[in-house]
């Protein structure tokens, strides 16, 4: 009887070498990739200058990603004296050698996206068609979501949340209640897409009697958008994992900021997505072991757009000076930002949530003209010092802030490019932040342009 031929064990499966033991398999699970993801997150209430940091780091990146939010975010990046404004696009799109990904956690307003591309093309953005990749799982923001956003805010009257009225909240609500519409729906059977769209319209009509949408006109628009969008769309999860296995450098640009996170921010005065580290994982389909550096971007003072508690807010001439010198007007909303002192109690909290491995302190130069600078170090609630950040906005509105006062430097820092050349008082200010948070400051912003960054060496 002929013996059966022996079948040799495969040496590789799906491109992975076959391991010989559980220990080896476990080790591969702990570190299956040749590279790690660098994440840039806002550490306060947004507008910290994340786009500038991403633009700087994107020069060395192969891929830059957005993972959450929509066109309620706003980044300005200055390149060769030209201001590029980004709302949906990753600001790394300026870098012609890297891919830009809009991940599944982002909600996309297609009219806004194509308008943003056109505006930045007019300013010199080129060849984006070969570099922009959009997730097929991302949800779509329709004009009707923006209409609903305005109606909901109007219903709240004097208790409105101060949203950007970009339709972000209603779109994420549609996603959570499972009647949202994704990019893959638009690119699939258009008849089915039309039925889903009509169902969404009818749902809102039941909620708002005066709600009106020209369904035929909208579907005609979106048939055109489908053709324009199709070449840009793919499965970004597989693309990213493949890129990490190849050792590609991946950079993630968080939108909004930690204190606007729907779970950890000053709820309900927050955005509708997770803009802390968790949103990076769910918004791109990445496991925790892919994360390397987590860079927290900290403005040298604190700002906030819209309503909600703000313990260190200034209502005096110093607040006005910060608004004026800092050009504190929202990129997206054009609203004047509220300004206040740096809040270390708040930053300790966001550092716990996000696990920063490094910091970038921006707009240090805005403090150049102040003789004295106050820094919040803790809060008192009901007469007692607390060692936590209040989860209730009622409690947060009642805290008494404990400040320390440090000397200003009364000299311009705008031309400084080495940490050792900063005035001693400015160096002390940076060291105060580092020592309190236990996180190194690696970069300091002292002006608008990408060249106005101090690289802090050990």
Swiss-Prot record:
<dbReference type="GO" id="GO:0044208">
    <property type="term" value="P:'de novo' AMP biosynthetic process"/>
</dbReference>
<dbReference type="InterPro" id="IPR042109">
    <property type="entry name" value="Adenylosuccinate_synth_dom1"/>
</dbReference>
<keyword id="KW-0436">Ligase</keyword>
<feature type="binding site">
    <location>
        <begin position="363"/>
        <end position="365"/>
    </location>
    <ligand>
        <name>GTP</name>
    </ligand>
</feature>
<feature type="active site" description="Proton acceptor">
    <location>
        <position position="47"/>
    </location>
</feature>
<keyword id="KW-0963">Cytoplasm</keyword>
<protein>
    <recommendedName>
        <fullName>Adenylosuccinate synthetase</fullName>
        <ecNumber>6.3.4.4</ecNumber>
    </recommendedName>
</protein>
<feature type="binding site">
    <location>
        <begin position="74"/>
        <end position="76"/>
    </location>
    <ligand>
        <name>GTP</name>
    </ligand>
</feature>
<comment type="subunit">
    <text>Homodimer.</text>
</comment>
<feature type="binding site" description="in other chain">
    <location>
        <position position="164"/>
    </location>
    <ligand>
        <name>IMP</name>
    </ligand>
</feature>
<feature type="binding site">
    <location>
        <begin position="445"/>
        <end position="447"/>
    </location>
    <ligand>
        <name>GTP</name>
    </ligand>
</feature>
<dbReference type="InterPro" id="IPR042111">
    <property type="entry name" value="Adenylosuccinate_synth_dom3"/>
</dbReference>
<feature type="active site" description="Proton donor">
    <location>
        <position position="75"/>
    </location>
</feature>
<dbReference type="GO" id="GO:0004019">
    <property type="term" value="F:adenylosuccinate synthase activity"/>
</dbReference>
<feature type="binding site" description="in other chain">
    <location>
        <begin position="47"/>
        <end position="50"/>
    </location>
    <ligand>
        <name>IMP</name>
    </ligand>
</feature>
<feature type="binding site">
    <location>
        <position position="178"/>
    </location>
    <ligand>
        <name>IMP</name>
    </ligand>
</feature>
<dbReference type="GO" id="GO:0005525">
    <property type="term" value="F:GTP binding"/>
</dbReference>
<dbReference type="GO" id="GO:0000287">
    <property type="term" value="F:magnesium ion binding"/>
</dbReference>
<dbReference type="InterPro" id="IPR033128">
    <property type="entry name" value="Adenylosuccin_syn_Lys_AS"/>
</dbReference>
<feature type="binding site">
    <location>
        <position position="337"/>
    </location>
    <ligand>
        <name>GTP</name>
    </ligand>
</feature>
<dbReference type="InterPro" id="IPR042110">
    <property type="entry name" value="Adenylosuccinate_synth_dom2"/>
</dbReference>
<feature type="binding site" description="in other chain">
    <location>
        <begin position="72"/>
        <end position="75"/>
    </location>
    <ligand>
        <name>IMP</name>
    </ligand>
</feature>
<dbReference type="InterPro" id="IPR027417">
    <property type="entry name" value="P-loop_NTPase"/>
</dbReference>
<feature type="binding site">
    <location>
        <position position="74"/>
    </location>
    <ligand>
        <name>Mg(2+)</name>
    </ligand>
</feature>
<keyword id="KW-0547">Nucleotide-binding</keyword>
<comment type="function">
    <text>Plays an important role in the de novo pathway and in the salvage pathway of purine nucleotide biosynthesis. Catalyzes the first committed step in the biosynthesis of AMP from IMP.</text>
</comment>
<keyword id="KW-0479">Metal-binding</keyword>
<keyword id="KW-0658">Purine biosynthesis</keyword>
<feature type="binding site">
    <location>
        <position position="47"/>
    </location>
    <ligand>
        <name>Mg(2+)</name>
    </ligand>
</feature>
<feature type="binding site">
    <location>
        <begin position="46"/>
        <end position="52"/>
    </location>
    <ligand>
        <name>GTP</name>
    </ligand>
</feature>
<feature type="binding site" description="in other chain">
    <location>
        <position position="256"/>
    </location>
    <ligand>
        <name>IMP</name>
    </ligand>
</feature>
<dbReference type="InterPro" id="IPR018220">
    <property type="entry name" value="Adenylosuccin_syn_GTP-bd"/>
</dbReference>
<keyword id="KW-0460">Magnesium</keyword>
<dbReference type="InterPro" id="IPR001114">
    <property type="entry name" value="Adenylosuccinate_synthetase"/>
</dbReference>
<comment type="similarity">
    <text>Belongs to the adenylosuccinate synthetase family.</text>
</comment>
<feature type="binding site" description="in other chain">
    <location>
        <position position="335"/>
    </location>
    <ligand>
        <name>IMP</name>
    </ligand>
</feature>
<keyword id="KW-0342">GTP-binding</keyword>
<dbReference type="GO" id="GO:0005737">
    <property type="term" value="C:cytoplasm"/>
</dbReference>
<dbReference type="GO" id="GO:0046040">
    <property type="term" value="P:IMP metabolic process"/>
</dbReference>
<feature type="binding site">
    <location>
        <begin position="331"/>
        <end position="337"/>
    </location>
    <ligand>
        <name>substrate</name>
    </ligand>
</feature>
<comment type="pathway">
    <text>Purine metabolism; AMP biosynthesis via de novo pathway; AMP from IMP: step 1/2.</text>
</comment>
<feature type="binding site" description="in other chain">
    <location>
        <position position="271"/>
    </location>
    <ligand>
        <name>IMP</name>
    </ligand>
</feature>
């Amino acid at each position: 009887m002929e013996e059966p031929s022996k079948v040799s064990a495969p040496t590789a499966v799906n491109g992975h070498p076959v391991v010989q033991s559980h220990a080896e398999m476990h080790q591969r699970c702990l570190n299956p990739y040749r590279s790690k993801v660098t994440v840039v997150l806002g550490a306060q209430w947004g507008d910290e200058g994340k786009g500038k940091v991403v633009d700087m780091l994107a020069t060395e990146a192969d891929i830059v990603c957005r993972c959450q939010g929509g066109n309620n975010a706003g980044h300005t990046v200055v390149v060769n004296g030209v201001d590029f404004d980004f709302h949906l696009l990753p600001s790394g799109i300026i870098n012609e050698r890297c891919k830009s990904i809009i991940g599944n956690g982002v909600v996309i307003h297609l009219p806004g996206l194509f308008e943003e591309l056109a505006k930045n093309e007019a300013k010199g953005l080129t060849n984006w068609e070969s570099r922009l990749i959009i997730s097929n799982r991302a949800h779509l923001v329709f004009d009707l979501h923006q209409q609903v956003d305005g109606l909901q805010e109007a219903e709240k009257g004097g208790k409105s949340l101060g949203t950007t009225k970009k339709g972000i909240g209603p779109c994420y609500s549609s996603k959570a209640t499972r009647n949202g519409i994704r990019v893959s729906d638009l690119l699939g059977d258009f008849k089915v897409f039309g039925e889903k769209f009509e169902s969404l319209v009818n749902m809102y009509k039941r909620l708002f009697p005066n709600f009106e949408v020209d369904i035929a006109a909208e579907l005609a628009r979106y048939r055109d958008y489908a053709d324009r969008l199709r070449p840009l769309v793919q499965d970004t999860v597989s693309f990213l994992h493949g890129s990490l296995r190849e050792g590609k450098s991946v950079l993630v640009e968080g939108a909004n900021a930690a204190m606007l996170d729907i779970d950890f921010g000053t709820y309900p005065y927050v955005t509708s997505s997770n803009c802390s580290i968790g949103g990076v994982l769910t918004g791109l389909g990445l496991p925790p072991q892919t994360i390397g550096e987590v860079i927290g971007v900290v403005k040298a003072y604190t700002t906030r757009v819209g309503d909600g508690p703000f313990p260190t807010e200034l209502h005096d001439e110093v607040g006005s000076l910060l608004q004026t010198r800092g050009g504190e007007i929202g990129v997206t909303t054009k609203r004047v930002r509220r300004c206040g002192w740096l809040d270390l109690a708040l930053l300790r909290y966001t550092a716990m949530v996000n696990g920063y491995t490094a910091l970038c302190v921006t707009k240090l130069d805005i403090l150049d003209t102040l003789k004295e600078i106050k820094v919040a170090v803790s809060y008192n609630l009901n007469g007692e010092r607390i060692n936590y950040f209040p989860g209730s906005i009622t409690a947060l509105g009642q805290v008494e802030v404990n400040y320390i006062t440090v000397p200003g430097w009364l000299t311009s820092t705008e031309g400084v490019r080495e940490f050792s050349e900063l005035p001693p008082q400015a160096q002390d200010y940076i060291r105060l932040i580092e020592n309190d948070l236990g996180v190194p400051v690696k970069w300091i912003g002292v002006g608008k342009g990408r060249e106005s960054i101090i690289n802090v060496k050990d």
